[in-house]
Amino acid sequence: MRVLALALVIVALGPTTAPTGEISLRIVNVITPQDVKIWEPPSVFAKKGDSVALKLINRLDAEHGYEIAAFGVKEVVDGGKTKEVKFTADKAGVFPIKCQLHPAHVVGQLVVLE
């Protein structure tokens, strides 16, 4: 199976295409009164049947989770560490991405197209 050339979307800029291979995501601190943290980019796009490889980079001190429940993805990335996640996007739809450790402040979505 081929590794998807994922398109990453930053809402204000619209879709952009990434080179074929692994996609890097990082946890970032958004300065707000609630000290919100998000995975960036928050949206990941794939096609049904594609193999997806995500590189999760946590440059913050605290551990953070990364969960896409619909695909059995559930990782904890320790502070200052990196983890790789691989799965097959075997169903189409929009699926929530959250931090299972801090669900109130880390959200995103995986969009799998037919």
Outline where the language-model segments fall.
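N-terminal post-signal-peptidase region of extra-cytosolic proteins
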Residues: 34-43, 68-71, 80, 84
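Non-cytosolic beta-sheet module surface loops
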Residues: 56-58, 101
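Extracellular/periplasmic metallocenter environments
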Residues: 18-19, 23-24, 77-114
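Residues within well-ordered beta-strands of beta-sheet-rich folds
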Residues: 53-55, 86
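N-terminal edge beta-strand
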Residues: 20-51
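Histidine- and aromatic-enriched segments that form or immediately flank copper-ligand environments
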Residues: 59-81, 109
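Non-catalytic surface loops within mature trypsin-like serine protease
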Residues: 29, 58, 70, 89-91, ...
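Sec-dependent N-terminal signal peptides
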Residues: 4-13
